[in-house]
Amino acid sequence: MERARPEPPPPPPPPPRQPPRPTPPRPLRPAPPAQPVEAATFRAAAAERSQSPSAQATAAMAAVASSCGEAAAAGAQAAGTRRLLQVKPEQVLLLPPGGPGVPPAPDEGAAAAAAAAAAAASSAQARLLQLRPELLLLPPQSAADGGPCRPELHPMQPRTLLVKAEKQELGAGLDLSVGSRRTTEAGPRASRAAKLDGTGKALDGRRSDEKKAKLEAEEAPRDALKGGEGKSLLAIGEGVIKTEEPDRPRDDCRLGTEATSNGLVHSSKEAILAQPPSAFGPHQQDLRFPLTLHTVPPGARIQFQGPPPSELIRLSKVPLTPVPIKMQSLLEPSVKIETKDVPLTVLPSDAGIPDTPFSKDRNGHVKRPMNAFMVWARIHRPALAKANPAANNAEISVQLGLEWNKLSEEQKKPYYDEAQKIKEKHREEFPGWVYQPRPGKRKRFPLSVSNVFSGTTQNIISTNPTTIYPYRSPTYSVVIPGLQNTITHPVGEAPPAIQLPTPAVQRPSPITLFQPSVSSTGPVAVPPPSLTPRPSLPPQRFSGPSQTDIHRLPSGSSRSVKRSTPGSLESTTRIPAGASTAHARFATSPIQPPKEYASVSTCPRSTPIPPATPIPHSHVYQPPPLGHPATLFGTPPRFSFHHPYFLPGPHYFPSSTCPYSRPPFGYGNFPSSMPECLGYYEDRYQKHEAIFSALNRDYPFRDYPDEHTHSEDSRSCESMDGPPYYSSHGHGGEEYLNAMPTLDIGALENVFTAPASAPSGVQQVNVTDSDEEEEEKVLRNL
């Protein structure tokens, strides 16, 4: 006999529930204090409805607006699935009650996207709407509890979001048994997520508990909203999600039994979006509601999670009209030249050209022999010019070139033969002739000293024929012709005095002038100047330095003072700080073998002299980088007086005119004994620029005929061999500076405004207009 199984105890009956009835509106509980998230706060409340097979129709309304404290009107209370919405002012997410969790749609320009919770086993799709203040969305009207849906406008204040989730009240004949509940859990990034409170297992229409959630706008794209089948929620009533400003008092939000307003009215950051309750039925598998757009600006967008209806997207193609660009050949003349009736193949034998036409010009200059095109153009130019009297000579030449290119090789052959005959006759007539283009026509400078010095000369070297000092760095140096032992110091900072020995015998030797540039350099040979014995300053200005002063110089900055002749003397000139940067003028006497070189100190008295440090290869001031010769001296020079041939400016000295552009004349890496002298151009002497500004470019040293220079050694007074002298010259230079007498400006004006004498084959330096008596006094004092 089969044993009877013990029956399991029956489940406890559900607590009795009162039939649902309409409830009057009542005020809500005060919401907890909200936390601001980007000037907007969120308070979330969710509710869960009892799920019965026949009670799955719900209505949800999400209102996204800028609140002014007034809440939107609420629909009838009903059981519905909880939804947790996080929205921004331009996005609204519409969810069906039972569907899988829909991930938020990506939005590039949005900081947060809408997120939704899934509750029931429905496959309806959610809609994500991207709204703008000028967008109006009106879904078709549908009945809610038999009543028509009426759009409702809620004026709101900006910077406040109002989101409401409502559930319609269940009918009286619906089953009120409690089914499986689903909870909505916030993701791990929602730190202050939902706080759920439950007090019972039945859903009461009049009593409900609130679920409070606080959401942050940036955490919305990563918040996962999950629905659990095995989790039950106790007695959750109506759910309200509301946000408002933290510092604004909250107005009452009342839930009524009237029909829920369906539709969307968007005006001035105000959006109310609702779905009819029939849209969320259990048999509604796809949400396809038509939308009506009103007043959509070009910047407004509507973004759907699913495929949007095709009628919402209208693309218009803007026709691009191509603009014709008229291209005119540069070789074509501007005036239309008629060549129709002009014969262009006249043979040279028929033209009557002389054997060697125009071999010389008026000045007797031998011209080049004509080539084939010149022979052809000379024949046909008169006929073409006669047919086109309105065309000028340039236009005729352009047309002749075009017509010559149109000829075939056979048509050109007679002219090539004629050009060869002319060339042979020209060679017989002028056997040693070599073509040399005139620099004037090709805009080249002649090989003259004045044009060489008019550029930005950086290194001037005058040597004997056996010694050539190549360019190594930006320096200013002068080597006196015929010197075997010389002295050297740079113009770098300021020497106490510039002393130069004289050659033992005054003999003519070439002066090699280097014009360095980036591409190449070239020397220019110039006959040496014969200097007249005129001192630059009165005799009382001269005082010879003692040998102890010279030998007391530090080793790192010492100069080797060597005399080329036993009787040669050195003389220095002292000058005050006001005229410290004036030119150093040489005055040599070709009468006697001992020759004196008077010079001017280039250090201002106000300049502090640091102690000497033996740095053999360093710059007190770094020289500027080498560039084009026109840019080597972009800054104004620091000389108070500029020799006109040392003046900076956009002078161009072509390297092609200098025949010696290859080593050893080109610059490169050379020994370090070359003095570094460009520190003289540094900022320390800028303040002395304005002292003699009235004399700049005004003294008559540059206006010489025959393009000769008179005093090219006025800028720098040092030779090439010997250790370089740097700016720190110690106490020896201090004695030179302390004994400087004062010199008035008028004396210097007389010096530099002296009238120039008539130049001859030998260059002269006329520095002052002192007489012979002063010369004798100077020689006696020295």
Swiss-Prot record:
UniProt keyword annotation of Isomerase present: no
Q: Keywords in UniProt for this one?
A: Activator, Cytoplasm, DNA-binding, Nucleus, Repressor, Transcription, Transcription regulation
Gene Ontology MF annotations: beta-catenin binding; DNA-binding transcription activator activity, RNA polymerase II-specific; DNA-binding transcription factor activity; DNA-binding transcription repressor activity, RNA polymerase II-specific; RNA polymerase II cis-regulatory region sequence-specific DNA binding
User: What role does this protein play?
Assistant: Acts both as a transcriptional activator and a repressor. Binds to the DNA sequence 5'-ACAAT-3' and shows a preference for guanine residues surrounding this core motif. Binds to its own promoter and activates its own transcription. Required to activate the expression of postmeiotic genes involved in spermiogenesis. Binds to the promoter region of CTNNB1 and represses its transcription which leads to inhibition of Wnt signaling. Also inhibits Wnt signaling by binding to the CTNNB1 protein, preventing interaction of CTNNB1 with TCF7L2/TCF4.
Q: Where are the compositionally biased (Pro residues) regions?
A: 7-35, 97-106, 525-538
Q: Provide the Gene Ontology terms for cellular component.
A: chromocenter; cytoplasm; cytosol; nucleoplasm; nucleus
Checking SMART domains in the record gives:
HMG
One Gene Ontology biological process: response to corticosteroid
PROSITE patterns reported in the protein's UniProt record: HMG_BOX_2
Question: Disulfide bonds, which pairs?
Answer: none
Could you tell me what induces this protein?
A: Induced in germline stem cells by retinoic acid.
* Protein name, entry field: Transcription factor SOX-30
The UniProt entry, under InterPro entries, shows: HMG_box_dom, HMG_box_dom_sf, SOX30_TF
Instruction: Provide the residue ranges listed under DNA-binding region in this record.
Output: 366-434
Subcellular location, in the record's words? Nucleus; Cytoplasm
User: Where are stretches of biased composition, namely Polar residues?
Assistant: 512-522, 555-574
Q: What is its main location?
A: nucleus
Q: What subunit structure does UniProt give?
A: Interacts with CTNNB1, competitively inhibiting CTNNB1-TCF7L2/TCF4 interaction.
Q: Which gene encodes it?
A: Sox30
Task: Give residue spans, biased composition: Basic and acidic residues.
Answer: 203-226, 704-718
Tissue expression notes: Expressed in the lung (at protein level). Expressed in testes (at protein level). Expressed in preleptotene spermatocytes, round spermatids, and elongated spermatids in the testis (at protein level). Expressed in pachytene spermatocytes during stages 3 to 8 of spermatogenesis (at protein level). Increased expression in diplotene spermatocytes at stage 9-11 and in metaphase spermatocytes or secondary spermatocytes at stage 12. Expressed in ovaries.
